[in-house]
UniProtKB/Swiss-Prot annotation:
Catalyses which reaction(s): GTP + H2O = 7,8-dihydroneopterin 3'-triphosphate + formate + H(+)
Function comment: Converts GTP to 7,8-dihydroneopterin triphosphate.
Native species: Staphylococcus aureus (strain NCTC 8325 / PS 47)
Matches recorded under InterPro entries: GTP_cyclohydrolase_FolE2, GTP_cyclohydrolase_FolE2/MptA
Enzyme Commission number: 3.5.4.16
Protein name: GTP cyclohydrolase FolE2
Keywords: Hydrolase
Record keyword Hydrolase present: yes
Length: 292
């Protein structure tokens, strides 16, 4: 049995089974290597979307940097075998400046670069990240950082936008109207998870504070907003406000819809509210879809 010098890293590697590279016969330079993806012949079908998923990259949401999880895709004609996936990352890097800004205009430019680099007509992106924002306690007005989850969706064909979506998921407090009605005192309440997917008008300019307007519709219609910091006067106010504004999941999604339907820059929306019931072993939920 061969003895290896275990005092060296290379010796320890070989002791655990590593071997020396062989002298191969295949090309080692890019220009000499076969590019299978670029093979051209009849491959029977066009592909609507092909690309990468779960690409984690730094993003900028307003003034905060966070991690974004991307899915990128392009179309593929039937006479091409595949796409060069490394060009997707190269396209992203051309727009990277301490993070990719999560705004529709920036994502549009990334997709235009992707179209050019991939030599395809259609391109799309979906990216999810954490949105951080300043939140003040309701009575003492103490500032802290709140958060919600956002997902941007954008697709283009040529220079035309074919899909423009924003999804926000936020948590709220809901107090049970039935519990309040039948009880001599108190009422059960719980955390509710509200998800709103909006379909944004592709031909109309969107308002500057669109995220805040959607989030306000989600939170203001609940029994109470959630806060990072609550002192005793704040806790008293939050508790009393929830009691003053009882909400079933059905109530909440209808009230949110009543606000969203007034936004002329939306073509429609999907709403779901899921209550993590505090007195049951199950959750309660409601869903609503609306198209103008």
């Amino acid at each position: 049995m061969t003895e290896f010098d275990l005092s060296t890293r290379e010796g320890r590697w070989k002791h655990f089974g590593s071997v020396d590279p062989i002298e191969g016969t295949k090309p080692t330079t890019k220009n000499e290597m076969t590019d299978l993806q670029s093979t051209h012949k009849d491959f029977l079908f066009e592909i609507e979307e092909v690309g990468i998923k779960n690409l984690v990259y730094p993003v900028l949401v307003d003034q905060y940097q966070t991690a974004g999880t991307f899915s990128f895709s392009t179309s593929l004609t039937k006479d091409e075998k595949g796409i060069n996936m490394s060009r997707i990352i190269e396209s992203v890097e051309k727009h990277y400046d301490n993070g990719i800004e999560l705004e529709f205009n920036t994502l549009y430019q990334v997709l235009r670069t992707l179209q050019t680099n991939m030599k395809q007509n259609a391109a799309g992106v979906d990216v999810s990240g954490k949105w951080f924002f300043d939140r003040y306690s309701p009575t003492t007005n103490i500032k802290a950082v709140g958060n919600a989850d956002v997902t941007y969706g954008l697709a283009i064909d040529g220079d035309k936008v074919t899909r423009k979506e924003l999804t926000i998921e936020a948590t709220v407090t809901t107090l049970c109207p039935c519990s309040k009605e039948i009880s001599e005192y108190s009422a059960h309440n719980q955390r509710g998870v509200v998800t709103v997917k909006t379909y944004i008008n592709k031909d109309q300019d969107i308002v500057d504070d669109y995220k805040n307007k959607i989030l306000d519709a989600m939170e203001a219609n609940a029994s109470s907003i959630l806060y990072p910091i609550l002192k005793r006067p704040d806790e008293k106010r939050v508790t009393e406000r929830a009691y003053e504004n009882p909400r079933f999941v059905e109530d909440l999604i209808r009230l949110i819809a009543a606000d969203l339907v007034e936004f002329d820059w939306l073509d429609g929306f999907d709403i779901e509210c899921r209550n993590e019931e505090s007195i049951h072993q199950h959750d309660a939920f409601a869903k609503l879809k609306y198209r103008k």
